A protein has these predicted regions:
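Phosphate-binding glycine-rich loop
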Residues: 1-27
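Generic structural signal for small/hydrophobic residues in well-ordered secondary structure
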Residues: 4, 28-29, 42, 77, ...
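Short hydrophobic alpha-helical segments of the AMP-binding
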Residues: 21, 28, 41-42, 102
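A short helix-loop-beta submotif of the ANL/AMP-binding
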Residues: 44-50
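Helix C-cap/helix->beta junction micro-motif
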Residues: 45, 104-105, 219
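Active-site phosphate-binding strand-loop segment of PLP-dependent enzymes
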Residues: 54-121
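Conserved core segment of the aminotransferase class I/II
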Residues: 131, 136-206, 210-221
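Short beta-strand
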Residues: 222-227
Length: 228
């Protein structure tokens, strides 16, 4: 009750979190390419996006470029893993580097983990909040949309340090009041699904990924096999 705020999808949870934690002129670090809402959400909150490029072919992070994006005005960093649109899954080593920078500069991490169960090739999802020293400076966003194939339901949540929960809920209340109560009840049931559900979900998506790669690559398309 002190950490979880339900909202109208992770999209609204992201907006509520930014409005609750950012002041005009603050800077927000985000990796590009990125899901289309992150930059505009920061701008609507009065903040300034600072972009760090993920490099092809496997969308690696340049640690020097990442470190150079942090300064005294940096208030937050957004991490989306598995990443939309690249399919990159951030490694524990990459997340540890991000965590070290967050601690050094006293920066809040906002993580969008909506694809956490859709991972391929033996990759593992590592929540940034599980990295040492990050539980108290991470807001984790998620939703029912992708894991349970109900994107139209618009049920999501933010898991925040207790000290931030009140501010996020206040903004959420004035944005949308709340997600549909019957759909929240259904979501609570879905969250108790057995582990076999998630394994079958990921396996099904991986089969479709492999099918598309097998069609595209022989025809001359350069493809990065998404990890998630």
């Amino acid at each position: 009750d002190m950490q979880v705020t339900g909202g109208c999808g992770s999209t609204e949870a992201m907006m509520s979190t930014m409005l609750a934690t950012l002041d005009p002129g603050d800077e927000v670090v985000m990796f590009e390419p990125f899901y289309e809402n992150y930059g505009p959400d920061a701008i609507l909150s009065g903040a300034v996006p600072r972009y760090v490029t993920l490099h092809e072919p496997d969308w690696t992070v340049d640690p020097d470029a990442l470190a150079a994006a942090f300064n005294d005005r940096t208030r937050a960093i957004i991490i989306n893993t598995p990443n939309n649109p690249t399919g990159k899954v951030f490694t524990r080593a990459e997340l540890t580097t991000i965590a070290e920078l967050c601690r050094r500069w006293d920066v809040l991490a906002i993580t969008d983990e909506i694809y956490e169960h859709i991972i391929y090739d033996g990759c593992r999802h590592v929540p940034l909040a599980a990295i040492d020293g990050m539980a108290d400076r991470t807001v984790t966003l998620n939703s029912l949309s992708k894991t349970y194939s109900v994107t139209g339901w618009r049920v999501g949540w933010a898991i925040s340090p207790p000290g931030l929960t009140g501010a996020i809920r206040k903004v959420h209340d004035f944005l949308t009041v709340g997600a549909a109560a019957p759909l929240q009840e259904a979501g609570a049931v879905a969250l108790s699904f057995p582990e076999t559900y998630y394994a079958e979900l990921a396996a099904g998506y991986q089969r479709r990924r492999d099918m598309l790669l097998a069609l595209l690559e022989p025809r001359g398309f350069g493809c990065f096999p998404p990890r998630g």
